[in-house]
């Protein structure tokens, strides 16, 4: 697609000698003897892009495959919901839809309470941090082994939380004995970490970490943005879990989701938009939300009625 979009006339490669047959099949032609060293030989080859290249033509017609963690490809029934007529978030229809969606989320996450806010997953994490601050849980330990763990450190500090950072190399596992020692010696109110560190593709050992944290009576908050929907997991022993509509739930980004297993406190000195307690106590929807986003998420969640979604 890159070649076609930029209308190039010719392409050059240094092809590995092991794949010369494949290169010729695609249409590449050798134009020089091998280069490099005896241990690492390469074939100078070119591809005439003005010729009638059957392979390139076939590639141009091929469907693009999306391997991003988000945004993701949508199922046809989810796409269909995005074409529906918008209706009021104050309507009985929308209230009923939201309640049904929350019920599905609570079952999938295995949490007592689910809350939906209009925003990205970052908003979900920020709302959790506002709860921590509002509860007087000011001292925390943030675990990081990738880009999004590092982001949690920055976010918690912006919420004026006093945090230490247990940081290991990108993609490395946390030393559980060292974590236990840090929590025993420190005066921590909460621990915050990423379940699946998207930047390096490592699924952290949340079971073991949870056991250590809860044995100390410490509150546990988890960024599960790219693990929820991709990995079957019960968050019943986690106090707060953040996720969104736009990753492995396979809907459209735009709805921030917080699962909680503890009482949500009222935050009188926090921006209303971050107040999970306020969002939950309302008998109607507190802020404007596009009905099509809720329709799409509700439909996407139907794929999780059985465990087949995780096996395929």
PLM feature spans:
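Terminal substrate-recognition subdomain of acyl/acetyltransferases
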Residues: 4-64
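A glycine-/small-polar-enriched, mobile loop at the entrance of the PLP active site in fold-type I
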Residues: 63-118, 122
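Conserved beta-loop-alpha segment that forms the PLP phosphate-binding cup at the N-terminus of a helix
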Residues: 111-141, 145, 149-153
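Active-site C-terminal subdomain of aminotransferase-like
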Residues: 73-74, 246-312
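Active-site phosphate-binding strand-loop segment of PLP-dependent enzymes
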Residues: 174-225, 229
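Active-site-proximal loop->helix
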Residues: 151-162
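Conserved active-site segment immediately N-terminal to the catalytic lysine
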Residues: 235-246
């Amino acid at each position: 697609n890159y070649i076609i979009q930029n209308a190039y006339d010719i392409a050059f490669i240094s092809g590995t000698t092991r794949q010369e047959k494949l290169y010729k099949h695609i249409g590449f032609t050798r134009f020089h003897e091998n280069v490099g060293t005896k241990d690492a030989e390469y074939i100078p080859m070119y591809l005439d892009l003005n010729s009638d290249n059957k392979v390139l033509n076939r590639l141009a017609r091929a469907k693009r495959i999306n391997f991003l963690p988000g945004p993701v490809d949508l199922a046809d029934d989810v796409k269909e919901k995005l074409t529906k007529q918008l209706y009021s978030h104050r309507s009985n229809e929308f209230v009923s839809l939201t309640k049904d969606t929350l019920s599905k989320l609570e079952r999938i996450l295995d949490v007592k309470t689910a809350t939906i806010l209009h925003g990205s997953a970052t908003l979900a994490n920020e709302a959790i941090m506002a709860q921590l601050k509002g509860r007087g849980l000011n001292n925390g330990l943030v675990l990081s082994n990738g880009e999004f763990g590092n982001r949690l450190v920055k976010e918690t500090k912006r919420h004026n939380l006093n945090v230490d950072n247990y940081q290991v190399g990108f993609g490395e596992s946390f030393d559980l004995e060292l974590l236990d020692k840090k929590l025993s010696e420190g005066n921590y109110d909460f621990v915050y970490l990423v379940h699946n560190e998207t930047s390096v593709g490592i699924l952290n050992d949340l079971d073991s970490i949870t056991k250590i944290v809860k044995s100390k009576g410490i509150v546990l908050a988890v960024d599960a943005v790219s693990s929820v929907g991709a990995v079957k997991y019960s968050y019943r022993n986690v106090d707060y879990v953040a996720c969104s509509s736009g990753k492995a739930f396979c809907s459209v980004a735009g709805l921030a989701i917080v699962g909680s297993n503890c009482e949500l406190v009222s935050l009188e000195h926090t921006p209303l938009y971050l107040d999970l307690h306020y969002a939950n106590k309302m008998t109607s929807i507190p802020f404007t939300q596009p009905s099509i986003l809720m329709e799409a998420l509700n439909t996407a969640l139907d794929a999780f009625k059985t465990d087949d979604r995780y096996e395929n």
